[in-house]
Curated annotation (Swiss-Prot):
Biased composition regions of type Acidic residues, renumbered to the chain: 376-400, 427-469, 694-703
Coiled coil regions, renumbered to chain: none
Name of protein: Mating-type protein A-alpha Z4
Subcellular location as annotated: Nucleus
Gene Ontology cellular-component annotations: nucleus
Region (Disordered) residue spans: 333-618, 633-762, 832-863, 877-912
Organism: Schizophyllum commune (Split gill fungus)
Predominant location category: nucleus
Family named by the database record: Belongs to the TALE/M-ATYP homeobox family.
Length: 940
């Protein structure tokens, strides 16, 4: 029968862990009682088979937890014993070491004390010195008194050898050891009287004779002098504050009644900062040195000053190291300056050589599209122009050096490309080798001159080593002189005579031969230009030389050349190129068919009511006749075929020509014989090489009757074959008609399908045709307004020369009465994101200084039509009214300027003003064009 029931066992198990922890805290007796109780419960659990499984599991879990706690406690106790033993051992070892060191110190002190006895006069003299630090200069009577005291302390034999000079010498040495003379020279300029006055203020006065302990650093606050005793040069900056605000608990208050103690004035206010801080600290340091001279009791500043003081030996080493580093840095700086001087001299010589090279260059050729893509970046061009500017500023006093046009050919800008010429390879190699010899001789002369001027041979050796420093980058090529270690003294002096270079020979360029007379002869068929094309047999040699100019002058001349119209009479060569025009070079590595990029921004998904605005650069070398009023107007119709895209087609009006022709210009040689040419497609300006589409352009010399017949037949055949239902034609402004600037049929089924959702590029296109791009302005109108780019080469080798102006490049020339002016407006609007800032050429500072241009009083209806059609983005939101401050007269002007900068587009007034200015400029250009045409018609 068990001693405990199942309920008692379960209850005890629930409280077993708490009772165990309590027993651990109480001690060994409580643990013994818990152990006995645990044994009895354990026996009952083992003997009673009727206990449920939950009670057995609980007893097992409680036993495991108690066992783990007991194990942890045992480990902790063992660790504590180990730590206690280690600490005891360390403590005993430290005590033993301390005892041994103390014994050694005692032995050393005893040996020092018993080595040599001190002279008998040192003790009385030293005691007097310590008590009279305010005036360590004893009088003769005091010296005799100290001498008598010393004789009384020693034997008669030693006393008879003592003299007054021994005491004088000791005081001199004592003042030097405690730093008296150093402080007097450093702080008082060697004045003994000023130093004595400071020491009296520090430690006492002449009237009071007291022991030094009464006036030490810790007790000298009660002996402060009055204000009138302090000299002006010894007063502190805090002296006035100390006199005005005395402490409340000052011992110098005259108190008559305890109730009125706080209201009384001090009888003699004292100064609490009579000396300057640096003087006071120096005197305190002097006191410390005096107290430590013979090992007496250390003062309160002894430990702190000793710990902060720096040993003289270490201070000397640091000073020597600092001086050595300073000398090394100075020498390195001098070597760097000499290297920079030699480098600058070499750069000047290179600049002079480049200037001589540019003088013999011929006239540049225009770049092709392939070569333009392979030119240098803008950063290289900027560096090139910067070097040119630097070379122009230098004096041309150098000798004529050799020219290397092959090295400088890659540095030419895209606008000025050196004409290709042929030279013998052997001559080029000789010139290159001569130029290398010149560079080497120049470097050697520089080194020789430096070795003569520099007297320090070691410095010269280090300089030569650093001048030809080997490359440290892995994989880099090593110089040819890297392994040579020859000192400058071992080099043999070489004397070079100045090299005599021949003047560069003139470069001759072969140009096309002049064409036969345009009257009475028919021009030959144009031949497509190619890099392998042979030159005519009869070629004229032309001496061409064109010096390079600065970047600013070059841009200004190019701008003026683009604005100025060409001369009216232009003679054409047999190959269709104007005489005097140098053929463009094409890259042999990349061969791509000529194409022209044209942008067709659409304001919406469908065809706008105002027509399609065509921008870009169709071809600046093609001259479209602005007087071709007989051409057929074109209409656009739109038919939405699917949600994926829209189809835009150009459909002719009934009875008009479907084939778009181009009338020859006044300067084209083909204008005199346009009726003699036949309408064949084989001699078209562009050849079609695509197998998918075989579309060619009609000949430009087709007569009006043939054009009408062809257009009628084409339109009738197209109407019969097309079964799609089209929308009624929309009237289009003539300036937006693509038929007026291109003689190609921009039919979407043939030339490509337009996708307004993503790009805006056609899916299928003939490579040699125009590259048409359509943009949806409703999605992102600001992204598609980009500046037009001039094509660097001709799109057609047989095209007529330029008669349009630079501003009208890429615009649409309309056959209307004001066609040129409207095309001018269209071109300017397409050159920038903001119409008001499209043609600005001045800086903001110049615009502020320059008076504003007067606004056109009555702009034409064309300006209002452009603003209302949505071609130019303007700011529709009216600015909020603001009241200008009285003191700021230009507040409104600055506010308007800030608003214009924050807005992506200009205001309507700004755009209207700019359009009016463009309209006036277009009218002026139109009048000039008409005058040129009249001059050309009369022959000069």
């Amino acid at each position: 029968m068990s001693l405990y029931s199942a309920e008692d066992i379960l209850k005890w198990l629930h409280h077993a862990q708490a009772e165990f922890l309590t027993a651990l805290a109480e001690g060994d007796d409580a643990l013994a009682q818990f152990q006995a109780q645990w044994d009895r419960v354990r026996a009952c659990v083992d003997c009673d088979p009727t206990l449920p499984s939950s009670t057995l599991a609980l007893s097992h879990a409680v036993g495991i937890s108690i066992a783990q706690i007991a194990e942890v406690m045992l480990d902790q106790e063992a660790t504590n014993h180990t730590i206690e033993d280690e600490l005891t051992k360390d403590l005993l070892a430290g005590l033993e070491r301390h005892d041994a060191s103390s014994a050694l110190a005692d032995e050393k002190t005893g040996a020092e004390l018993s080595a040599t006895p001190l002279p008998p006069y040192i003790e009385p003299c030293y005691r007097w010195l310590v008590n009279h630090l305010d005036n360590p200069y004893p009088t003769k009577a005091i010296k005799e008194e100290l001498l008598d005291q010393a004789r009384q302390r020693t034997s008669p034999d030693v006393a008879q050898h003592l003299a007054l000079g021994d005491i004088d010498n000791w005081f001199i040495a004592a003042r030097a050891r405690m730093g008296w003379g150093d402080i007097r020279r450093r702080l008082f300029g060697g004045s003994r009287s000023l130093m004595l006055q400071s020491t009296r203020l520090m430690w006492g006065t002449e009237e009071t004779s007291r022991d030094f302990t009464d006036g030490c650093i810790a007790k000298r606050k009660g002996a402060q002098p009055k204000r009138e005793e302090v000299q002006p040069h010894l007063r502190s900056s805090h002296d006035v504050v100390a006199f005005k605000i005395p402490p409340k608990a000052s011992p110098y208050f005259l108190i008559t009644d305890s109730s009125t103690a706080a209201c009384e004035e001090p009888l003699h206010p004292q100064s609490f900062a009579a000396l300057q801080p640096d003087v006071e600290f120096a005197l305190a340091h002097l006191e410390v040195n005096a107290k430590e001279m013979y090992g007496l009791e250390p003062t309160e500043l002894a430990d702190s000053l000793n710990s902060s003081a720096v040993d003289r030996q270490f201070a000397t080493q640091d000073l020597v190291a600092f001086r050595a580093a300073l000398e090394a840095a100075t020498a390195a700086k001098q070597r760097q300056a000499r290297r920079e001087q030699r480098r600058a001299q070499k750069d000047r010589m290179d600049a002079q050589r480049r200037a001589e090279d540019r003088k013999c260059y011929p006239s540049p050729e225009p770049l092709s599209a392939d070569e333009l893509s392979g030119t240098e970046s803008d950063e290289d061009l900027d560096d090139f122009y910067a070097s040119d500017d630097a070379s122009d500023d230098e004096d041309d006093d150098g000798e004529d050096l050799d020219t290397r046009p092959s090295d400088l050919m890659a540095q030419m800008c895209p606008q000025l490309v050196a004409t290709a010429f042929s030279k013998d390879g052997s001559a080029t190699e000789d010139e290159d080798s001569n130029s290398d010899d010149t560079d080497e001789s120049t470097d050697d002369e520089d080194e020789d001159s430096d070795s003569e001027n520099d007297s320090d041979s070691e410095d010269e050796e280090e300089e030569d080593e650093e001048e030809e420093e080997p490359v440290k980058i892995a994989g880099a090529k090593r110089g040819r002189n890297d392994d040579e270690e020859v000192s400058p003294l071992a080099k043999k002096p070489r004397i070079f005579s100045p090299p005599v270079r021949p003047r560069p020979q003139a470069i001759r360029v072969s140009l096309p031969s002049p064409a036969p007379s345009s009257r009475g002869s028919t021009p030959t068929s144009p031949v497509s230009p190619s890099p392998k094309a042979k030159r005519p047999a009869q070629a004229t040699s032309l001496l061409a030389s064109h010096p390079m100019k600065k970047r600013e002058k070059l841009q200004e001349e190019l701008r003026k050349a683009g604005l100025a119209p060409p001369s009216a009479p232009v003679l054409m060569g047999p190959d269709g190129v104007p005489l005097g025009t140098v053929r463009s070079r094409s890259s042999p590595s990349v061969s791509s068919p000529p194409s022209v990029s044209v942008s067709l921004p659409l304001p919406s998904r469908g065809v706008p009511s105002g027509g399609i605005k065509v921008t870009g650069d169709p071809t600046p070398w093609v001259n479209w006749d602005l007087e071709a009023h007989t051409q057929a107007p074109r209409d656009l119709t739109a038919a939405t075929k699917s949600s994926a895209g829209c189809s835009v087609d150009a459909v002719p009006l009934p009875g008009k020509s479907r084939s778009l022709t181009r009338s020859p210009s006044i300067s084209s040689i083909s204008s005199a014989c346009s009726t003699s040419s036949s309408g064949s497609d084989t001699d078209s300006l562009f050849s079609v090489t695509s197998d998918a589409t075989d579309i060619t352009e009609p000949d430009e010399a087709t007569t009006a009757d043939e054009t009408t017949t062809q257009s009628t037949s084409a339109s009738s055949s197209r109407d019969t074959t097309s079964q799609q239902k089209r929308m009624p034609p929309l009237s289009i402004d003539p300036r937006f008609d693509p038929a007026l600037w291109s003689k190609y049929d921009l039919s979407p089924p043939a030339d490509g399908r337009l996708h307004p959702s993503d790009g805006l590029r056609p899916s299928a296109f003939v490579p040699t045709k125009l590259d048409v791009r359509v943009a949806n302005l409703a999605q992102n109108p600001a992204r598609h307004w980009s500046a037009s780019k001039r094509s660097p080469t001709r799109a057609s080798h047989a095209a007529a020369p330029i008669v349009s102006y630079h501003h009208a490049t890429g615009s649409i020339a309309s056959p209307a009465q004001v066609a040129f002016g409207e095309g001018q407006l269209t071109s300017v609007l397409a050159t920038g994101q903001k119409a008001g800032n499209a043609r600005r050429r001045t800086t903001p500072v110049q615009r502020r200084v320059t008076p504003k241009a007067q606004e056109t009083s009555e702009p034409s209806s064309l300006v209002d039509g452009i603003l209302s059609s949505g071609l130019a983005d303007v700011c529709r939101e009216a600015p909020k009214p603001a009241k200008a401050p009285k003191n700021d007269r230009r507040y409104l002007e600055r506010r308007e300027r800030r608003l214009s900068k924050s807005s992506p587009v200009d205001s309507a007034d700004t755009v209207r003003t700019r359009l009016a200015e463009i309209e006036q400029e277009a009218a002026r250009l139109e009048a000039e064009r008409q005058s040129l045409q009249r001059l050309a018609s009369v022959g000069g």
